[in-house]
């Protein structure tokens, strides 16, 4: 980032704004993403992100917020399982919790499915797996 941009961000106390935003995140990965945000100059990208924010705010205002409390990064565990490795009990429980969170989020969205948003492709990408979730938690 150009030096003059850093001066402007410092003057605006941008780091404090990011810290306040990060306080509202549900998991360490989201916190890291929030802290890494930087101003964007591409108008199309800014407009797309503003539309996402608008629609997320509208859904929250109309239907309340879903729970994201069980989010954990299980990428390493998924990759190891995909390669045939055995997962630890902690990793299995983390996977089950992520599956529960995905299922709850998909259910939350289905209760307000009559409202179209630019977030719909993200919600459509969610793939709940109640069978696997139950197999892990009942073992």
Regions found by a protein language model. Name each.
Residues 1-139:
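Conserved amphipathic alpha-helical "coupling/scaffold" segments
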């Amino acid at each position: 980032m150009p030096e003059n941009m850093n001066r402007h961000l410092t003057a605006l106390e941008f780091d404090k704004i990011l810290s306040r935003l990060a306080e509202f995140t549900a998991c360490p990965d989201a916190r890291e993403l929030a802290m890494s945000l930087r101003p964007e100059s591409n108008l199309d990208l800014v407009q797309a992100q503003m539309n996402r924010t608008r629609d997320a705010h509208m859904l929250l205002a109309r239907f309340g917020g879903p729970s994201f409390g069980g989010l954990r990064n299980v990428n390493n565990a998924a990759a190891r399982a995909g390669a045939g490795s055995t997962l630890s009990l902690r990793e299995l429980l983390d996977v089950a919790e992520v599956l529960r969170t995905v299922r709850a989020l998909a259910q939350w969205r289905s209760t307000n499915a009559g409202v179209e948003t630019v977030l719909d492709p993200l919600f459509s990408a969610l793939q709940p797996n109640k069978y696997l979730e139950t197999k892990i938690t009942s073992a």
